[in-house]
């Protein structure tokens, strides 16, 4: 069995006339999602059975279950996870005119729809780093020798960083991105450790001047 990766809107247009419940696999863990599931059930009468786990765990389960899988929909994060699932044939093709009218073409494919987006930002401490310099920073600048031992970032195995590097490769090419990665490593204030929040806290504690982390970690 192949599954659909998309948002809740498509469930109301695709599943409402076929099933009294839908099995939703998700790697997200936010209360706002739960509220959406409740609203969907109230609007359609369709029960949402939620199975939560990290994406790699869900992917492994889907691949092992194959056509016997009970999953109907997957909600996960990051283009890296989407690319992996698409490449491994987990998704079935889907088309929704409703979603097509609401979601820009660069945030959807023949196999999935994007329902949320997040930015990977460069954080700084205004008490120790010039705001004037910071406002003009871009990812490429993180490899500038002037920031030697001033940058913190998660491990390269993290899917958020892998997606960031992929975007740099797409825009700057393999050669320039490889040189950039080496420069970034030279500028690290410490060996990569912890999640995105740990990088922000490192800047707040004065362990580094710059940190790379997703937007939503700032409020945690």
Report the location of each language-model feature.
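Positively charged n-region of N-terminal signal peptides that target proteins for export
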Residues: 1-2
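Bacterial N-terminal signal peptides
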Residues: 6-13
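Sec/Tat signal peptide C-region and signal peptidase I cleavage site
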Residues: 14-19
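Cleaved targeting-peptide boundary
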Residues: 20-24
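Extracytoplasmic ligand-binding site segments that recognize negatively charged/polar headgroups
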Residues: 27, 31-34, 56, 70-208
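Short alpha-helix C-terminal cap/hinge motif
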Residues: 35-50
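Short, well-structured alpha-helical segments in soluble
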Residues: 60-67
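C-terminal lobe and pocket-closing loops
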Residues: 206-220
């Amino acid at each position: 069995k192949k599954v659909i990766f998309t948002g809740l809107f498509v469930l109301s247009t695709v599943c409402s006339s076929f099933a009294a419940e839908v099995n939703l696999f998700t790697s997200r863990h936010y209360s706002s999602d739960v509220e959406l599931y409740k609203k969907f059930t109230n609007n359609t009468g369709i029960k949402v059975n939620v199975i939560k786990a990290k994406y790699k765990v869900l992917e492994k389960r889907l691949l092992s279950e194959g056509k016997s899988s009970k999953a109907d929909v997957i909600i996960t994060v990051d283009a890296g996870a989407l690319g992996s699932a698409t490449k491994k044939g987990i998704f079935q093709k889907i088309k929704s005119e409703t979603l097509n009218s609401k979601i820009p073409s660069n945030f959807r494919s023949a196999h999935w729809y994007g329902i949320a987006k997040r930015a990977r930002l460069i954080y700084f401490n205004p008490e120790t780093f010039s705001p004037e310099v910071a406002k003009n920073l871009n990812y490429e600048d993180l490899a500038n020798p002037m920031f030697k031992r001033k940058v913190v970032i998660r491990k390269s195995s993290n899917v958020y960083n892998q997606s960031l590097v992929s975007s740099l490769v797409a825009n700057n090419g393999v050669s320039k991105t490889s040189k950039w990665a080496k420069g970034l490593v030279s500028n690290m204030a410490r060996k990569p450790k912890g999640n995105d929040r740990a990088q922000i806290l490192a800047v707040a504690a004065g362990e580094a001047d710059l940190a790379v982390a997703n937007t939503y970690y700032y409020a945690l």
